[in-house]
Amino acid sequence: MKKRFYMFPIILLMMAIFTACDPDNNQEFPGNGTVTGSYEVKSDIQFPMSLFLTGIPEEYAAFKEPLASMVAMRESALAQELGKAEINLGFRKITYLYPSCGVKGDSITLSAVAFWLGYFDNGVWNDLKPENICLMEHYTITSDAETPSNAFALEMFITGNTLTIMPDYIGYGITKEKPHPYLNHDICAINSIDALTYGYDLFNDSSKYGMSPEWKLYLAGASQGAGNAVAVHKYLDTHPDLATKWNFASTNCSSGPYSPVVTIDKYLADGKVAYPVVFPLVMKTMFDSDPDIMKSFTEEMAYSQNYLAVKDEIDRMIAGKEHNTAAINQLFIEKVRKTVDANLADGEIYLTDILSPAMLDKESPICKALYQCLEKNDLTKGWTPVHPMKLHYSSQDMVVPQENSLAILEAFGEDIVTLEHASFPADHTTTCSLWMVDLFSKGF
């Protein structure tokens, strides 16, 4: 299917801009996941592109008519190519459960989605043959409603004619009652490899036509998803037989926390942060994932009195999975931020309003313990990439500092790493949106 049939989502993307278990590798191709078992389909839906158009918010109502016209033109062109009188372009989305392993090495069932393109011909769904596979890692969320299995992922529009696999991660979807291991790159990589394994099996069992014979695997993601994509890249390149079996080609991502150490270093050096929810997310992960390191401390020891006054409320918001990151960050501004001056932007908060003096002291025992946990998840160390990666970033990103991308380049060199700076001064969200446009328009 030719790329011209996907050009209409570019407007949607521009709207977005401006508004640890030990793997045994015992399975045969196509997977080599970390555990054995089988998938379970929870839902299998096919829906036309026009269904998405009906969900455009009222403030963007003016876009509906031109978008509908563009969809109609693409469908007409595809119908002509297929020799059909009329078709309706759409997606097939299958939500499934699959076995993997939890933070403590226990067996766990996780959820993910697999989706690919197709069309309706006289109301009958027809799959199209995907040209490649994309393992797409989703960005940071705190609301279960945002998970790939529960939402209409914008990433569906940017991966072209691919079989795209999107895992929910531990703590979302079927496991929403569990804490999410934020920035635990190793476990997220293993869970993603398992999602890929069983998603591919599911596709082979469900699709009429199968994959194109020369398919490749591409990894992608933005923000937290970028870190997880590079973590999967590490897993594949340190398991070369697995990389070969999966026809691994490259990684393309944006604005990822590849080095949690560098990220926290930058926050501490600046003395302020524009994404305060990162601190409870990180601290909860470290206490849950590394109890041996953090056993001498409590979460309360990490925080200021300002934060402790609302800690229970923030904990409930994170655990309940009903509030997005914007809502939680706003609570920080409203109830935790006490110090305001000319050097602080509207959405920023000084670390002294969030963290205890001990946590702000890199020589203190609790801060050293935190850094020990962060070091375990630093993707700039402990491996040598084989396959190329393209990383988008911005010097104006105050959420995930550019130092992360620069650290990857310094660690692995220009032969492996291509850096793509935002084409104009862009914050975190805009940089990720520009990445979507670039990936959509240029491909992997």
Predicted features along the sequence, with ranges:
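Accessory cap/linker subdomain of secreted extracellular hydrolases
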Residues: 254-382
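Primarily recognizes the serine-hydrolase "nucleophile elbow" in alpha/beta-hydrolase
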Residues: 198-274
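Catalytic-loop region of hydrolases
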Residues: 24-121
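Alpha/beta-hydrolase active-site loop
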Residues: 182-206
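Short beta-strand/loop motif that positions the catalytic acidic residue
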Residues: 385, 390-397
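Short, surface-exposed "cap/lid" segments of acyl-processing enzymes
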Residues: 104-111, 115-160, 172-176
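C-terminal catalytic histidine-bearing segment of alpha/beta-hydrolase fold enzymes
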Residues: 265, 366, 371-373, 396-407, ...
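C-terminal motif of bacterial Sec signal peptides marking the signal peptidase cleavage site
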Residues: 16-20
